[in-house]
Swiss-Prot record:
The spt4-spt5 complex mediates both activation and inhibition of transcription elongation, and plays a role in pre-mRNA processing. This complex seems to be important for the stability of the RNA polymerase II elongation machinery on the chromatin template but not for the inherent ability of this machinery to translocate down the gene. Disulfide bonds: none annotated. Component of the spt4-spt5 complex. Interacts with RNA polymerase II. Transmembrane segments: none annotated. GO terms for molecular function: RNA polymerase II complex binding; transcription elongation factor activity; zinc ion binding. The lineage of its organism: Eukaryota, Fungi, Dikarya, Ascomycota, Taphrinomycotina. It comes from Schizosaccharomyces pombe (strain 972 / ATCC 24843) (Fission yeast). This is Transcription elongation factor spt4.
Length: 105
């Protein structure tokens, strides 16, 4: 992404990566493969950070994005997934942790 356009960008509710709506719609999320833009992304997010070296970054470990694709990530994403969707993710081996600041584990 050359330039972050906050009016056209969305953040993934699962991993927090920030991408243009069109990328999510055409390719899905690069980290978890979901492609239902309306269910799995939100246009409302706070703070952004660029993560270029996931395995070397203490911030990436702290934000729990150290196993994800390098890119721009939101520190908080407004919205949560419903329980049916969370269960479906769990069956696929994806551990969902809300990125809206409500999870304190």
């Amino acid at each position: 992404m050359d330039k972050l356009n906050r009016t056209r960008s969305r953040a993934c509710l699962i991993c927090g990566i920030v991408l243009p709506h069109s990328v999510f719609a055409n390719k899905g999320c690069p980290n978890d493969g979901v492609d239902d833009v309306e269910t799995f992304t939100s246009p409302v997010f706070e703070g952004i950070m660029a993560m270029m070296s996931p395995t070397e970054s203490w911030v990436a470990r702290w934000q729990r994005i150290d196993t994800f694709t390098p890119g721009i990530y939101a520190t908080r994403v407004q919205g949560v997934l419903n329980e049916d969707v969370v269960e479906s993710l769990r069956r696929r081996g994806i551990n969902y942790r809300p990125r809206n600041g409500t999870s304190w584990d």
